[in-house]
A protein has these predicted regions:
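Bacterial Sec-dependent N-terminal signal peptides
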Residues: 1-32, 523-527
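Acidic, low-complexity Ser/Thr/Gly/Pro-rich repeat segments typical of extracellular/periplasmic
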Residues: 16-195, 209-215, 236-431, 448-472, ...
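Conserved structural position at the C-terminal beta-strand
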Residues: 196-198, 303, 482-484
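Acidic, glycine-anchored loop motifs typical of Ca2+
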Residues: 199-208, 485-494
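Short, composition-biased linear "edge" segments at structural boundaries
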Residues: 216-224, 502-510
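Extracellular interaction modules
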Residues: 222-227, 518
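Long, low-complexity intrinsically disordered regulatory regions
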Residues: 228-234
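Phox homology (PX) phosphoinositide-binding domain
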Residues: 505-509, 513-523
Length: 527
């Protein structure tokens, strides 16, 4: 009886074991194959609330919530379940009459054993007698850098109101692939408003300021296959985003957009804080205020914002409290000691505070260990934080600059400690020259010489056929970027959805350019 019981136990265990696909043999590299669907794929006159898809092997479903795209959009995401070799989908929404639905599974389906993907499998059905077969195709790219990203939404609307992306989810939609390409399939005949969206929050609605958006200047007819959309981030309405005091004598106002035309009305008596100066950032969206009375504790002002006055109070760092935590001192922010320096340019030293006094006798410059009796010192900014040291630099020479204590005095009366900076002046043959010849250009343009990381190395403005020469370039790989500066304001301008303003167009020279030491390179760029 003991042996009979053991045999029965083994039989029961095997009957209850989890079923897994067989292993062994040659490695499987083929994706799963669909054997059948219920209802049948491409069926008409059905309400396919329950769908069954059978495969030729065991499958798994990953990231269905993000990968499974259903168009037209449903109110609720369908539920999915895998059982053996079958995938079950349940749609709880009430389906629209006479509508073609497309279920695109993206990269969610793969075989269980090797993970081979069945990419972009589609299940299509119609609740009416006609299966819509028209499509709209195209590409989406970033308007500023022409990058093409995957999973950007492209949406179609029958409501043509300009504000529709803010308040209504699309009728049809699709997502871009890694090349920025999209295809919205199985749509009904007609004209549509088309919108591209970087949908960060996944709600199929536009959130201004946080998300990129792109639009077509005109309605798009079904069947069109070359609709290009350019994504951009709109400028926010001008207002103060935040204010802060990063240290005694300094307050910073950060705005949502360029604020250099905004009038600030001071409630604080500026003579009490001993106001010194104010300066905007390059983008004009950040204002730094300098004042000399470092025992001041607050700064107040108001500005007009759309017909009403907004009052702002900035709590200031007091010098006494700052000294208890950090040393309040005049510091050099130039950290490229022992670096190479372009002999054709002044040597620049940036300081933490505006400078009020320079003692030239406390600057000692040596050229290959030999003292230089005369050097030129000047500031290149109105705030007097960027001190330039100029001399007729010799090529292939070692320089050492010593600034003795008290060589500089800032607006707070602080003096520098001893500072020693060293650099090497390279030879002219260590650099290359790049000439860019334009032809066919009549409109105002900005030409940027950039590196492979899109950092701007040099920039010039042109409005005609010309030759632009860039001298003393470090040997490396460069690119040319051109901004079509329509309003001739010297910068790239973004777009505006409601006002139908497209972002300014940009172009890239189609090839990378290698600059070598002691070489001249000429590039022709025809429009």
């Amino acid at each position: 009886m003991r042996y009979i019981g053991l045999i029965c136990l083994i039989f029961i265990f095997n009957s209850c074991a989890i079923q897994v696909p067989p292993s062994g043999g040659e490695k499987d590299t083929k994706p799963p194959k669909v054997l059948s669907t219920t209802p049948e794929n491409y069926s008409t006159n059905i309400n396919a609330n329950n769908i069954e898809i059978e495969f030729d092997e065991y499958v798994q479903l990953k990231d269905a919530n993000t990968q499974l795209i259903i168009s037209p959009l449903l109110n609720y995401q369908p539920t999915t379940k895998i059982r053996k070799k079958k995938l079950y989908i349940h749609i709880s929404d009430t389906l629209k009459a006479n509508t073609t639905y497309t279920l695109n599974f993206g990269t969610s389906i793969s075989d269980l054993n090797e993970g081979n993907l069945l990419e972009n499998y589609q299940y299509i059905f119609s609740t009416g007698s006609i299966l819509d077969s028209l499509k709209i195709k195209g590409k989406v790219e970033n308007a500023f850098n022409l990058k093409k990203d995957k999973n950007q939404l492209v949406m179609l609307y029958k409501n043509f109101d300009d504000s529709i992306p803010y308040k209504e989810r699309p009728l049809y939609f699709s997502k871009t692939n890694g090349e920025g390409e999209y295809s919205i399939n199985n749509i009904s005949p007609g004209s549509y408003k088309i919108i591209a969206l970087e949908d960060k929050d996944g709600n199929y609605l536009y959130s201004k300021g946080d998300e990129l958006i792109g639009f077509s200047d005109s309605l798009v007819s079904s069947g069109k296959e070359d609709v290009k959309l350019r994504l951009f981030k709109e400028s926010l309405a001008l207002k103060l985003a935040r204010s802060q005091s990063s240290g005694p004598g300094q307050a910073t106002l950060i705005f949502t957009a360029a604020a250099d035309t905004l009038k600030l009305n001071w409630l604080t008596d500026l003579s009490k804080i001993d106001f010194y100066s104010q300066v905007f950032s390059i983008e004009k969206d950040t204002l730094t205020i300098w004042y000399k009375n470092t025992d001041s504790d607050s700064l107040s002002f108001y500005y007009n914002n759309g017909g009403k006055n907004d009052t702002v109070d900035v709590r200031l760092f007091k010098r006494k409290s700052e000294n208890s935590r950090n040393k309040f001192s005049l510091e050099s922010q130039t950290i490229d000691a022992n670096s190479n320096h372009n002999f054709s340019e002044p040597y620049q030293i940036e300081w933490s505070h505006p400078i009020s006094k320079v003692e030239r006798g406390k600057f000692i410059l040596k050229e290959d260990s030999v003292p230089i009796s005369k050097i030129d010192l000047f500031f290149s900014d109105s705030l007097k934080t960027k001190l330039n040291v100029n001399h007729k630099w010799k090529q292939k020479s070692q320089y050492e600059l010593t600034i003795l204590p008290g060589g500089l005095v800032d607006i707070f009366g602080l003096r520098n400690d001893t500072l020693i900076l060293k650099w090497f002046s390279k030879s002219e043959v260590d650099y290359g020259t790049l000439a860019l010849k334009f032809s066919g250009r009549k409109e105002a343009s900005i030409v940027q010489l950039i590196d492979e990381k899109e950092n701007v190395i040099r920039q010039v403005r042109v409005n005609r056929d010309t030759v632009v020469t860039f001298n003393y370039l470090d040997p490396m790989i460069y690119r040319f970027k051109l901004i079509n500066d329509k309003n001739d304001n010297g910068k790239w301008d973004t777009g505006n959805l409601i006002n139908h303003i497209q972002p300014e167009e940009v172009e890239y020279y189609p090839e990378l350019i290698t600059v070598r030491s002691n070489w001249d390179v000429e590039v022709k760029w025809d429009k």
